[in-house]
Amino acid sequence: MEQNKGRVTIPTDLDVVPQTLEIMDEWGADALRDCDGTEFPQELKNTGAKVYATYCTTRKDNEWAKANPDEVQQMYIMSSFHTATEDSLKIHLMDHLYPAMLKVNDRDDIRKWWEVTDRTTGEVVPVSEWTYEKESGDVVVHPTKRFHEYTVSFLAYIMWDPVNMYNAVVNDWKDVEPQITFDVRQPKTKAHCMEKLRQFLDTHEYVDVIRFTTFFHQFTLIFDELAREKYVDWFGYSASVSPYILQQFEQEVGYPFRPEYIIDQGYMNNTYRIPSKEFEDFQDFQRREVAKLAKEMVDIVHEYGKEAMMFMGDHWIGMEPFMDEFASIGLDAVVGSVGNGATLRLFSDIKGVKYTEGRFLPYFFPDTFYEGGDPVKEAKENWVTARRAILRSPIQRIGYGGYLKLALQFPDFVEYIKDVCREFRTLYDNIRGTTPYCVKRVAVLNCWGKMRSWGNHMVHHAIYYKQNYSYFGIIEALSGAPFDVSFISFDDIRNNPNLLKDIDVIINVGDADTAQSGGENWIDETVITAVKEFVYNGGGFIGVGEPAAHQWQGKFFQLDDILGVEEERGFNLNTDKYNWEEHRDHFILEDSEGEVDFGEGKKNIFALPETEILIQNHQEVQMAVKNFGKGRGVYISGLPYSFKNSRVLYRAVLWSSSAEDQLHCWYSTNYNVEVHAYVKNGKYCVVNNTYEPQDTIVYKGDGSSFELHMDANEIKWYQI
């Protein structure tokens, strides 16, 4: 396709028909879409552009939901903790929850599907010792054990879809009926939804792509009594439940279900929790069942000669695109929201679809497009951040969403996006059909493995958290780095003795006893001996934060012999420490003038006698290196994402794999500028990741070099 047109999707609405045609021409868009709160204008049916229709599988049909209240979508909720000070204790279930969003499910057998837990002992309270008062909404525990803490785990119907509620609150929608979420997995609703899909296809013959949003369960998102976000887990499964589903689960696994398998002491099995066997069984079951039902809908779409696209987000729980079941669904495309490089890799790395599309920011909503707002700034940051990842794992299309009329009020924004669209088309034409040059094979090791590829240290989609940004920086840096990146689990190591032979460097990043670091997996002799053998024979190991950390047999850092450091937790105060000398002239630090931003870092890390400390701060080690046999270990206390830190990580990978001599290969001496080579296509590019001009020396694949001046954000293409 010619370079000035195509590969771009834009939103439209009834009140911007002429303007839509103008933007189509200006941005070179070849696809049009509707959005939540908009309608597709009939006047645009025959523009020659592909037409996307957003199709919500689980909402936008309140008439059905109200007529079938037993098949409204449900979620598990745990009450707050309550301490018993008397023989009887009342726990109000809806405390600190938005009353219009949730409705307690007392229709099904609460003795089976609810659970009262003594959190002081961890024991389940017998059903004979608690009752539910429907009028007050209280669970009464009697008799209690005084000064023990109690919680109630219960089912609630989702009476206001969380995504619809979020959109309504952000956009201040008035007099709009809250959309009820219904459960497509249940028999009556499934039959209704299949027929409804056919009716939609019958009446929308002009639509080319059905953009499913999504299949079929919302990630965990709960609002408090003030309509503020109370709990969010973009990967959360707690809103994918119902007695109907759980009975099927029981039949498959052969043991009775407990609410605690979902509630998990109130942590809701978030991605920092080491998953239990029962929760893994539940996820396996959900993946199979969701994929099976999604395939039925996709098959119907194909029967009508249209494409089926999935939006990766919202009601997407159970789809798991990096797991084996996903390919069986037969989707044509996946579209995802681009928050940064890692969120782009969440869908650009998906196999088994014809194309992937990135919905870029800003979304055309009034929270960005208001008088005094600066949408160009957000657009620049979004594009330049995501571009690193696209250059490693290209998407095939880009797009935008929201209210087009808002964007039109900012001419400089319209002009900038025109440039982005043009740049993307050039980029894609140059790198399509090839794999970029990768200097090393890097594996991120945690409890989740490939299922959470690129989702490590992500709580909500691309949202900053003080407690994890120093770890997420590693993942973001990897998203645009010239490495062949994989994500492996401890079970992968147990099940495949040869797995590590195809890896150059292992990275383990996170806090002790989390799923990211690994916890008790590090006292499994199969795991720890396999990793030690890998490093001893020449592999690299980079540990960030509290890697391989679990108190066991006189150690907290179980790989202290590789990493060369240990954490002082009071148990080693009696042992004197004399190794505090820094060596800031190390290969890893050559581009950073000896200074590194460790973010939150870690306190109380000390070095063992054989270790080379690179940086310590007030006798707390922040970075250290050590040899172990033919291999090497690198310890880093934290590494927030920045261009400088990305270079530090790059050098750490090379050093740990004893590959310092490979530095000057497709390389820029200025860490603000990066080089990506596409040998099969005979092309390479040099990209300025900053908003200022940059000067650098570029090294090509043969080691030859040249000086280069680059404008802000510029990308230059060359023939090899």
What residues fall within each predicted segment?
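Noncatalytic N-terminal accessory/assembly modules of large enzymes
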Residues: 2-59, 63-99
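The substrate-binding groove and active-site-proximal loops of carbohydrate-active enzymes
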Residues: 6-12, 29-35, 171-191, 274-291, ...
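A short, well-structured beta->alpha microelement
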Residues: 8-21, 35-39, 310-319, 475-499
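Catalytic domains of carbohydrate-active enzymes, especially glycoside hydrolases
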Residues: 9, 15-52, 196-213, 326, ...
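Hydrophobic targeting/anchoring helices
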Residues: 44, 64-65, 197-198, 208-215, ...
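Polysaccharide-binding and catalytic clefts of secreted carbohydrate-active enzymes
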Residues: 70-328, 346, 432
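Extracellular ligand-binding/catalytic regions of CAZymes and related secreted enzymes
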Residues: 221-224, 405-439, 479, 558, ...
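A glycine-rich, often tryptophan-bearing local segment used as a flexible ligand/cofactor-contacting loop or short
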Residues: 518-594, 599-601
